[in-house]
Amino acid sequence: MNFIVYPALDIRNGAVVRLQQGDYARQTRYDDQVLPRAQAFADSGATWMHLVDLDAAKAGGYTLAPLLRQITRATGLQVQTGGGVRSRDDVARILDAGAARVVIGSLAVRQMTCVIEWLQAFGPERITVALDTRQDAGGVWRLPVHGWTEVAEATLEALAQQYAAAGLRHLLCTDIARDGMLSGPNMDVYAYLRALVPAVQIQVSGGARDVADVVAAKMAGCAGIVLGKALLEGRLALKEAVQHGSVADPGDPLPCGELTEPVCRYRSV
């Protein structure tokens, strides 16, 4: 399994922005140079990027298809992208526009049966399920939805296992407490997921700040890491991150069994 560094761009009203902990009222706007930034990703050695339509995530109706076509044609990058995916037709349109994978977030929690049908229809390499999670006072990883204002009945553990059983291959998980905070990823939750669903490739998202975080994700056996704010603010050089992500490990990641014991306190009861 090749470790993938995903430089990320979140787009709102045509501009590159970042939200702090997913809050639209706590937005930082950077610029509208989306295509030049994507080209810079490719020039730095990235082979993939992560593209989010924040307008669609809020209102529905993916709007970035023209931009997606420009990016893939101009840069050669493979793109996983989402935001506002509500139907099978949405998935098909985004794939037709050039996406390598479509990211499905809120709907993956609310309508799992539909998403599993799409997974089977389009194939496991074309879908990434994105689950945003927050740990409750009892240590259970919950799944906030509707802009993180409500909490789903299902737990992270339950959904991850059900999707794994249905053949899911790519799972992106964001610890809400770390999102946009530059405080480092919560590696406990990723080790937990890797032990729980070892056949699923786990992507780290939220809090990455430096090369050490990239290395930690790789050494934990994760499949990739999404880099957003740290790149936009110049705290992390993408070329260096890609180089560290591609370096062969001195040994295999820890077997899943060795990861289970330290994180068993996070299992739901």
UniProtKB/Swiss-Prot annotation:
* Molecular functions per Gene Ontology: 1-(5-phosphoribosyl)-5-[(5-phosphoribosylamino)methylideneamino]imidazole-4-carboxamide isomerase activity
Coiled-coil region(s): none
Q: Which GO terms describe its biological process?
A: L-histidine biosynthetic process; L-tryptophan biosynthetic process
What Enzyme Commission number(s) does the record list for this chain?
5.3.1.16
Q: Where is the active site?
A: D10 (proton acceptor), D132 (proton donor)
Query: Which Gene3D superfamilies does this entry report, sorted A to Z?
Result: Aldolase class I
Name assigned to this protein? 1-(5-phosphoribosyl)-5-[(5-phosphoribosylamino)methylideneamino] imidazole-4-carboxamide isomerase
What is the organism field in this record? Xylella fastidiosa (strain Temecula1 / ATCC 700964)
